[in-house]
């Protein structure tokens, strides 16, 4: 997730907020199916998952702090920020779950300020089959776009129309605003406030869930405060630190730099095949 506007300076409170928000998305993706839609059943599964998640290793973290670029000031250019501040404005980290379902599968969480776009999404990238019929195609992905423009789409590869057997990237797309054109889709905080008014607790953090979450994140935050975790810089309005692609590649994620979503003109790939 990221935003072109800093939206305030991410002091310790900002770090905590980002951690809790990321933890909620992580839980909803990885937790076991609850016994029912009852709020306590859902929150029980969140707590169970968090207790099975290992504390974040400082060796599996990439931190960044934005600098002045594109006519915008850097983080330390703010008069209220100490010139020697080591507060990160970007973080990529890896979570590991120690249970039979997810053991060995890395979960990469990324969040930052002053990036090129603001979005929240979940990307499940699938490995290539052991015997792949078509060489050099991008991996398939299931993408859940939380905001903006809620959507679920599957990145896949399809045969280019015509006599050629070449494969090109495409997607199966369910964008909510297109599928449900005549229905009002509430904003995130609208739905949350309505849940609060109606006494629905499933989207709110329980005390034991918060404690389990901090057992994962707090050691890392202490290490950052003590200057034990180095950080790099990135320009305001960029997609993050230069080493980001190298970092995620260490954990098996492959970034397809040529892919855009939504893809409406796959014919452009014909000249590159």
Predicted features and spans:
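Secretory/organelle targeting and membrane-embedding segments
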Residues: 1-273
